[in-house]
Amino acid sequence: MSFLRPTLALLAVTALVTTSAQLNGYSKKEVTPEDTELLQKAQSNVSAYNSDVTSRICYLKVDSLETQVVSGENYKFHVSGCSVNSDKELGGCANQNCESSKYDIVIYSQSWTNTLKVTSITPAN
């Protein structure tokens, strides 16, 4: 029975480290249709943009997604997209032949308060 103690201790530490990483940092997530719908809903609604978000883009494709648990959830979408000139062009790109670049779009969601905010749009590194 004493041989189980080190194994159980290791499992407990591993669970604690994993939980801490998910609460404090971003974790990769498989993109689902629901995630893409959340991106479209927030990114196409200019009133959902924080006042300091001045970039305006449409997205062609979601390349990957990371999430972070906070007082809700941050979604960091890595997308291919194009700069646009009007708020009517936000969301999915109507012009699939635009000159695209890579962007990171961070959306904050808190489902129990119906909060959905675009907190940043930055060129990807």
From Swiss-Prot:
Indicate which residues are glycosylated according to the record: N45
Top-rank taxon: Eukaryota
InterPro entries associated with the record: Cystatin_dom, Cystatin_sf
Q: Where is this motif: Secondary area of contact?
A: 68-72
Q: List the disulfide bonds.
A: none
The site feature described as Reactive site is recorded at: G25
From the UniProt record, which GO molecular function terms apply?
cysteine-type endopeptidase inhibitor activity; peptidase inhibitor activity
Keywords assigned: Glycoprotein, Protease inhibitor, Secreted, Signal, Thiol protease inhibitor, Virulence
* GO biological process, alphabetically ordered: symbiont-mediated suppression of host innate immune response
Of the GO CC terms on this record, one is:
extracellular region
SUPFAM superfamilies, A to Z = Cystatin/monellin (SSF54403)
Query: Where located?
Result: Secreted
UniProt entry tagged with the keyword Glycoprotein = yes
Q: What induces it?
A: Expression is up-regulated during infection of host tomato.
| Record note on quaternary structure | Interacts with the host papain-like cysteine protease PIP1. Interacts with the host papain-like cysteine protease RCR3. Interacts with the host papain-like cysteine protease C14.
Family to which the UniProt record says this protein belongs: Belongs to the cystatin family.
Q: What is the protein name for this chain?
A: Cystatin-like cysteine protease inhibitor EPIC2B
Q: Which gene encodes it?
A: EPIC2B
